[in-house]
Amino acid sequence: MKKLLLLLLFSMTASANPYAEAIKIHSAVYSYISEVSPTLYMLNACNSDLYVPTLMFSVEQTYNLVPANAQSYEIVNTIWKTQEHSMMDPRLEASLIMVKQGLRNPETVTEVQAACEALNSYVKTRFYWEYSTSG
């Protein structure tokens, strides 16, 4: 009877499922990425100087979502490397194409640049602590 209770106790702990922690990490990181990726995609499409610092800040934020160990960080890095177009909404993809084409078209370049500047302003406001010294 004691052995049965001990077996039941072990089967109910996190050690019984070695993938439980990885599932939690994936869920947290994908949730965060789905929130920030539209902004990152648009900054990239606008060829913004804010793209790389904002991307790096976002990666650092995902490190804060996981336990502080090498295996967790490796999972985070792998997710960021493979996520680029795997979660893109078709409407966002259409917007990216319009921005890229608009920047190449002399008739629309001014309007698209204004929209990109508005995005830059939004990002600087949203991440004010990151960009407060870079006027």
Summary of predicted features, one role per range:
Residues 55, 59-135:
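Compact alpha-helical subdomains of small soluble proteins
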Residues 13, 17-19, 91, 112:
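Short, intrinsically disordered, low-complexity terminal segments
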Residues 9, 39, 108-109:
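Residue-level signal for mature regions of secreted extracellular proteins and peptides
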Residues 3-14:
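Sec-dependent N-terminal signal peptides
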Residues 17-56:
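Immediate post-signal-peptide N-terminus of mature secreted/exported proteins
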Residues 1-2, 16, 84, 88:
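Generic cytosolic/nucleocytoplasmic N-terminal low-complexity/intrinsically disordered segments
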